[in-house]
Every structure is written in C-alpha cells, then in structure tokens.
Swiss-Prot record:
Residues 1-7 form a propeptide. It is a multi-pass membrane protein. Pfam families: ATP-synt_A. One of its GO terms (cellular component) is mitochondrial inner membrane. It is found in: Mitochondrion inner membrane. This is ATP synthase subunit a. F-type ATPases have 2 components, CF(1) - the catalytic core - and CF(0) - the membrane proton channel. CF(1) has five subunits: alpha(3), beta(3), gamma(1), delta(1), epsilon(1). CF(0) has three main subunits: a, b and c. It comes from Trichophyton rubrum. Gene3D superfamilies: ATP synthase, F0 complex, subunit A (1.20.120.220). PROSITE patterns: ATPASE_A. Keywords: ATP synthesis, CF(0), Hydrogen ion transport, Ion transport, Membrane, Mitochondrion, Mitochondrion inner membrane, Transmembrane, Transmembrane helix, Transport.
Length: 255
C-alpha cells in the first residue's frame, strides 16, 4: 500500500501554461509557459549577475569576480585550443554566451520543484541546428565550393569515394541532432533518476520508524547523486562548447 499513487518521473518535464491572454478581435492567443518563463528567468539572472559583477569590479577581487574570471578563462582556453589563437578570438563572445546560457539553465533545473528547460530536445536541437547551420555558412563564405572537400577523406581510393562521401555527409548532417540530443538526454536521464529515487525514498521513510532508518541509505545516495548532477551540469555545458568550437574549426580549416 505504501507504493500507491506513484508519481510519474516525466511529469516534471510537462510544459504548462502559466498565463494566457485571448484577443478575440484578431483571434489571437498569447500564453507564457513554464518553459518560456525559465528561459526568461535564466536570461535575467545572467544579465543581472554580469552587470553587478562588472559594476562592483574592484582591484581586490571578491568571490563572484573570481568565479566569473575562472569561467571566462576556461571558455577562452577551450576556444583557443579548439579553433586557434588568432581566429578563435572572433568567436569567443558567442561561445562564452552559449556556455553561460546552457550552464544557467542546467543549474536552474537542479532546484527542487523547478523546470529544466535544457532537458527538452526542442531547445537543445534549436541551438545545435543554429550552430551547425552557422558553421556551414561560415565554411561556404570562406571556401566557396571548396567547402565540399570536407566530405572527401584524404587518401581515399577512387572506388570507395561515393560511399565514403555519403557516410561523411550523413555524419555531418547528424551533428544537428547529436549535439543537442547529447545535452538533453543527459539532463533528462539524471532528473528522472532523481525523481524516481526521491519518490521511492519518501514512501519508504514515511511508512514507519524502521523504514525511516532504512530510508537513510537511499537518502544519502540522493545527496551524493545531486552533487554528481551539479558536476554534470558543468561538464555538459563544456562538452557542448568544445564540440561547437570543433565544428567551427572544421569549417575554417576543412579538416
């Protein structure tokens, strides 16, 4: 009986209307969902933190300034190592903004009873599609038709050329999906596991003193796994920008 009314682990990812407005004159309905709300909140937090840190910048750095500088240095190192020290500087603002946006949405999703926007493939696919499309346009802009040499492996036998070109083309197009799917799948699976474990632990611990003591074991695991999820939030943000820089480098150098 203690396992009745099991909560669906997918319920936390449901997109719901928080506010809606119907304009009957022009037959228009405007709504604000929890998905859009958390995107707006993350953007406001990012802008506010950066403005406050910049405004309060002093000769002796505080913890907030040191955190920002550490993130700045980490992203800058990724851009320089993945692209190059000369052309990489041009794309650093975009990569830095992309990292901060993904990281902030990942962290907001870790707050209990909040909404994780990066667990939705529609958002991560939109970002990954934009990145790959932009890298493709960049490659055509710099190399024109020579950009197609990216799909021709060096030293390829002539007989295998059509097959390998097709494989390279499919692999290139799959970047649109794989880049976003990797992020959303990792965030989604981690949040689902936390919900399942939390619901299971709560039902055990609320069944009596003996079960309460037993429930301390999975409760400790939940806290440990929450720390792991915090690390994953940072790691997945960095993996996303590393691959983004790699795609930009491929378009610039054709390899």
């Amino acid at each position: 009986m203690m396992f009745n009314n099991i909560i669906s682990p997918l319920e936390q990812f449901e997109i719901k209307d928080l506010f809606s407005l119907n304009i009957n004159i022009i037959n228009l309905k405007m709504s604000l969902t929890n998905f859009g709300f958390y995107i707006i909140i993350s953007t406001i937090i990012i802008l506010t933190l950066h403005l406050l840190i910049t405004y309060n910048n002093k000769l002796i750095s505080n913890s907030w300034t040191l955190t920002k500088e550490s993130i700045y240095a980490t992203v800058h190192s990724v851009v320089i190592n993945q692209i190059n020290s000369k052309e990489g500087q041009n794309y650093f603002p975009f990569i830095y903004g992309l990292f901060i946006f993904i990281l902030m949405n990942n962290l907001l999703g870790l707050i209990p009873y909040s909404f994780s926007s990066t667990s939705h493939f529609i958002l991560t696919f939109f970002i990954s599609f934009t990145v790959v499309l932009g890298a493709t346009i960049l490659g055509f802009q710099k190399h024109q038709l020579k950009f197609f040499s990216l799909f021709v492996p060096s030293g390829c036998p002539l007989g295998l050329l059509p097959l390998l070109v097709l494989i390279e083309l499919i692999s290139y197009l799959a970047r649109n999906v794989s880049l976003g799917l990797r992020l959303s799948a990792n965030i989604l699976s981690g949040h689902m596991l936390l919900v399942i474990l939390s619901d299971f632990t709560f039902k055990i611990m609320s069944s009596g003193i003996f079960y309460f003591l037993i429930g301390l074991i999975p409760l400790a695991f939940i806290f440990a796994f929450s720390g792991l999820e915090l690390g994953i939030a940072f790691i997945q943000s960095q993996v996303f920008i590393v691959l983004t820089c790699s795609y930009i480098r491929d378009s610039l150098e054709l390899h």
